[in-house]
Amino acid sequence: MRTNTTATVLLAAAVALLLATAARGDGGDGGCGKEDAAAGRDRARARGLKIAAFFSILVCGALGCGLPSLGRHVPALRPDGDVFFLVKAFAAGVILATGFIHILPDAFDNLTDDCLPAGGPWKEFPFAGFGAMVGAIGTLVVDTLATGYFTRALSKKDAATAAAVADEEKQSAAATQQHNHHHNHHVVGDGGGGGEEHEGQVHVHTHATHGHAHGSSALVAAVGEDDKETTLRHRVISQVLELGIVVHSVIIGISLGASQNPETIKPLVVALSFHQMFEGMGLGGCIVQAKFKVRSIVTMVLFFCLTTPVGIAVGVGISSVYNESSPTALVVEGILNSVAAGILIYMALVDLLAEDFMNPRVQSKGKLQLGINLAMLAGAGLMSMLAKWA
């Protein structure tokens, strides 16, 4: 899993570099959109708001991502508790609305913008919808291939362990039989009738214990195997979900950091803080269920919390050359947004909502089933309302 974290870091760096390079305005762009952008410019006020956004988004992301981990200390928030299902459903609704309401419309706007060349293909084909479809299908492929790969690797490891245990049991059984054979001969030599009775007792006791041990081992092995597969599934889900979040978080951060209009930044600070917190709740829930080691948990949480703030810092650094209305920037941002939307929509519907909604615990409790439906609608509704400001 460390390889996946490294890949996520490299992806974030590549997205930031790509946007920074693509957003440089050049003479061929005709200064499209620069007049509107210059209307409310105020560098001093904008800088203060960006600093506030940096820390606000960082803290809210940490709070959201850390909330599910409180289950270790608060019984109500344990992964197998009803409250945890409600929190995850709410967060999944937020992620679903993020894909449908926030990111996908932005992708359509970018790829149909008036600043794009009139003779280009961008207005003749719905590239934003196509990108979302590719993102969803790509996530499905990665999801299934990764799960299959790690499941096969786990099965091979378990098979090797089982073979080693079987060999050890055979050797132990052979040693026990040899010991019993020697002991029985010694007893028979001391007295005929008593020796036969004692030998029978040893024989019955050995087989009863042997059968009991094998029955318990089989039960423990079956439960352990199921738990391993579930944990493995959650690990794949958390890694893929973080990949989708990273792509659009970098874009959001760079766009906010490059803006010089305080009236544009001000509502974004509040909206993105809530957005980061709710999204963090969804990711944090997956991380807790994945049962990562402490080092991996800290790495994933820190990376999630820092992605948007670092994007803001990058945006501030390139603000003097950044032109979000340049054709190249519009195309790159639109494609990345559409793919990110497809990833998040797939993850929310398939890996988060469908999995929890079909969970036997939820299916057996009518009130919990109603509760997670309402929680999902609340999360999607609140995130949709934020689209008015962000």
From Swiss-Prot:
Residues 72-82, 146-235, 289-296, 351-369 are cytoplasmic. GO terms for cellular component: plasma membrane. Keywords: Cell membrane, Glycoprotein, Ion transport, Membrane, Signal, Transmembrane, Transmembrane helix, Transport, Zinc, Zinc transport. InterPro entries: ZIP (IPR003689), Zn/Fe_permease_fun/pln (IPR004698). Residues 1-25 form the signal peptide. It is a multi-pass membrane protein. Residues 26-50, 104-124, 257-267, 318-329 are extracellular. One of its GO terms (molecular function) is zinc ion transmembrane transporter activity. Residues 165-199 are annotated as: Disordered. GO terms for biological process: zinc ion transmembrane transport; zinc ion transport. It is found in: Cell membrane. Induction: By zinc deficiency in roots and shoots. Glycans are attached at N4, N110, N323. The chain crosses the membrane at residues 51-71, 83-103, 125-145, 236-256, 268-288, 297-317, 330-350, 370-390. Pfam families: Zip. Zinc transporter that may mediate zinc uptake from the rhizosphere and may be responsible for the translocation of zinc within the plant. PANTHER family: ZINC TRANSPORTER 5, ZINC/IRON TRANSPORTER. Plants overexpressing ZIP8 show decreased zinc concentration in shoots and mature seeds, increased concentration in roots, and are shorter than wild-type plants when grown in field. Belongs to the ZIP transporter (TC 2.A.5) family. This is Zinc transporter 8. It comes from Oryza sativa subsp. japonica (Rice). The gene is ZIP8.
